[in-house]
């Protein structure tokens, strides 16, 4: 067994390694043991505390244990050992590492039962299987992915994977956590074009997917330093059976075409109980990074740029324009954001809440520099607030920066431009014509109104609403009903008479009161609301 010195000193206290199956545990100083298996380097350590790099608190390697002569590992394709990647954090590196600890406190250590055993014969077999699939699918994946990534659906509600035998439906299984499930019936490559997430599978498998926020797991001031950069969405992925998944393709918005980005900077961040574990992807393609024989966790692409490197990172980006109709003064919102389908969907949803309508525009043709400032201007000399937008990444769900301007009744076309602040280079322009707004307004469905729904379905609600106790409490809490009005409804003798008394009382209070009533009914009897909405289609 080859030995190699690591920069970390081993703990002076020896702990008994966890017992696995019937194997006997041995007390060893395992911090210096490295076992080479093919191209993989497995660091064996008897304490996960040894694997936390003291300067950053980040775990670069999963815990492993030794029983008899067998090495067990947790991650089948783990990141390089601490020795191999410690050059990212040299002792004279003065970058602000301390705020980047991500609370990676090693209190939740893995037990031996959490670490699957893999014999050398099994590894050889798995490698052969993976190689066969990759050799058959790789050419298809590479050529097709480059095409499909330019055609990613902007509609995130497109809940289908494109597979080798056609489309595969994605099922929403938990709306509160935004969690989805999909069953891949056969081996092959599958792509969810609405998100850019892809899988290469060996056999049929069920995959569950949820979407996370970087800001909930690490401090986003990372991206304001030149050393770190969020490179794509965050996905929480599980699979059953796990071994059926040969590759995961994680989307990123980093531009590789200019040759300014070193693919060795790409890391996959896994968020686990013990902290953040970093893994190098097997390869990096123009629109996604590949994990082979992956472990499953909350994961996403993170760039670690070598210390002292001074350059701007080019990324693919989107310009999103929304207009808010008004008879006297039409308002526009303009966003400049990284090309992230999940981020676009979040902005769409937020704008839709305020009846904003997105205009169809093309993105910037060339990559833009992350962290650079850009100036928004227009041909009509309309006041833009703010004029300057900084191209940065904010997780979906956070407040996104945008520029706003008013165009009156807009009887003439408006030319919009975005220029790079430092050099004055034009990076994007478009023309918005009055007819564009008319076409969008004609094709867009009218905004949904809870008040209108209650009015249109008065008779159905009067006949079908059930127990009103919770609804009455909601209306009183929101100051729609007084205590006396609530008692008047409750004094009615029959269910339908109570319903009629409530509906009539709230309708007299206006649309805002009806909106509150609709929200309450939707939360307490969603099936009734869903049924009535279907009847109205």
Curated annotation (Swiss-Prot):
Reported impact of residue 55 to A: Does not affect cleavage by HIV-1 protease
Keyword Nucleus: yes
Variant or mutagenesis effect after changing residue 495 to E: Abolished formation of inflammasome filaments. Abolished ability to induce pyroptosis
Subcellular location, record wording: Cytoplasm; Nucleus
Variant or mutagenesis effect after changing residue 157 to R: Does not affect sensitivity to Val-boroPro
Superkingdom of the source species: Eukaryota
Keywords: Cytoplasm, Disease variant, Host-virus interaction, Hydrolase, Immunity, Inflammasome, Inflammatory response, Innate immunity, Necrosis, Nucleus, Protease, Ubl conjugation
Effect of residue 394 to E: Does not affect autocatalytic cleavage; does not affect interaction with DPP9; impaired interaction with the C-terminal fragment of CARD8 in the ternary complex
A Gene Ontology molecular function term of the record: NACHT domain binding
Entry comment describing in which tissues the protein is expressed: High expression in lung, ovary, testis and placenta. Lower expression in heart, kidney and liver. Also expressed in spleen, lymph node and bone marrow.
Record site: (Microbial infection) Cleavage: 59-60
Role of this protein: Inflammasome sensor, which mediates inflammasome activation in response to various pathogen-associated signals, leading to subsequent pyroptosis of CD4(+) T-cells and macrophages. Inflammasomes are supramolecular complexes that assemble in the cytosol in response to pathogens and other damage-associated signals and play critical roles in innate immunity and inflammation. Acts as a recognition receptor (PRR): recognizes specific pathogens and other damage-associated signals, such as HIV-1 protease activity or Val-boroPro inhibitor, and mediates CARD8 inflammasome activation.
Entry remark concerning the domains of this protein: The disordered region is required for activation of the CARD8 inflammasome.
Name this protein carries in UniProt: Caspase recruitment domain-containing protein 8
Organism: Homo sapiens
């Amino acid at each position: 067994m080859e030995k190699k010195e690591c920069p970390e000193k081993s703990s002076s206290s020896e702990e008994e390694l966890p017992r696995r199956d019937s194997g006997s545990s041995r007390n060893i100083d395992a911090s210096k043991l490295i076992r080479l298996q093919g191209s993989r380097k497995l660091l064996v350590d008897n304490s996960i505390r040894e694997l936390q790099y003291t300067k950053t608190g980040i775990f670069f390697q999963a815990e492993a244990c030794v029983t008899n002569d067998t090495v067990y590992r947790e991650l089948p394709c783990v990141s390089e050992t601490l020795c191999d990647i410690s050059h990212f954090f040299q002792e004279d590196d003065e970058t602000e590492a301390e705020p980047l600890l991500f609370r990676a406190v090693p209190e939740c250590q893995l037990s031996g039962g959490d670490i699957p055993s893999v014999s050398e014969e099994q590894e050889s077999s798995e490698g052969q299987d993976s190689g066969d699939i990759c050799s058959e699918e790789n050419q298809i994946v590479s050529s097709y992915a480059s095409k499909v990534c330019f055609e990613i659906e902007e509609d995130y509600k497109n809940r289908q994977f494109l597979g080798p035998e056609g489309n595969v439906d994605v099922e929403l299984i938990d709306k509160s956590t935004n969690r989805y499930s999909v069953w891949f019936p056969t081996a092959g490559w599958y792509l969810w074009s609405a998100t850019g997430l892809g899988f290469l599978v060996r056999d049929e498998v069920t995959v569950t997917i949820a979407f996370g926020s970087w800001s909930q797991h690490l401090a986003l001031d990372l991206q304001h330093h030149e050393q770190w950069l969020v490179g794509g969405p965050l996905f929480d992925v599980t699979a059953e059976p796990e071994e059926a998944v040969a590759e995961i393709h994680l989307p990123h918005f980093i531009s590789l075409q200019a040759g300014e980005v070193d693919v060795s900077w790409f890391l996959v961040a896994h968020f686990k109980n013990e902290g953040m574990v970093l893994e190098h992807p097997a390869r990096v393609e123009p629109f996604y990074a590949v994990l082979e024989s992956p472990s499953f966790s909350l994961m996403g692409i993170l760039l670690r740029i070598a210390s002292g490197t001074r350059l701007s990172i080019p990324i693919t980006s989107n310009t999103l324009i929304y207009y808010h109709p008004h008879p006297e003064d039409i308002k526009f919102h303009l966003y400049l954001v990284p090309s992230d389908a999940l981020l676009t969907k979040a902005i769409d949803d937020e704008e839709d809440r305020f009846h904003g309508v997105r205009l169809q525009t093309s993105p910037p043709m060339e990559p833009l520099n992350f962290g650079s400032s850009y100036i928004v201007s227009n041909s009509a000399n309309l006041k833009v607030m703010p004029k300057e937008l900084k191209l940065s990444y904010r997780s979906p769900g956070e407040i996104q920066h945008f520029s706003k301007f008013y165009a009156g009744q807009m009887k003439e076309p408006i030319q919009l431009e975005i220029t790079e602040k430092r050099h004055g280079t034009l990076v994007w322009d478009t023309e918005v014509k009055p007819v564009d707004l008319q076409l969008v307004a004609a094709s867009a469905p009218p905004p949904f109104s809870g008040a209108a729904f209650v009015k249109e379905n008065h008779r159905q609600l009067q006949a079908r609403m059930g127990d009103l106790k919770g609804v009455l409490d909601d209306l009183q809490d929101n100051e729609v009903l007084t205590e006396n009005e609530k008692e008047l409804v409750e004094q009615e003798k029959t269910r339908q008479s109570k319903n009629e008394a409530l509906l009539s009382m709230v309708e007299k209070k206006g649309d805002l009161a009806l909106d509150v009533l609709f929200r309450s009914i939707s939360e307490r009897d969603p099936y009734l609301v869903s049924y009535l909405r279907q009847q109205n289609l």
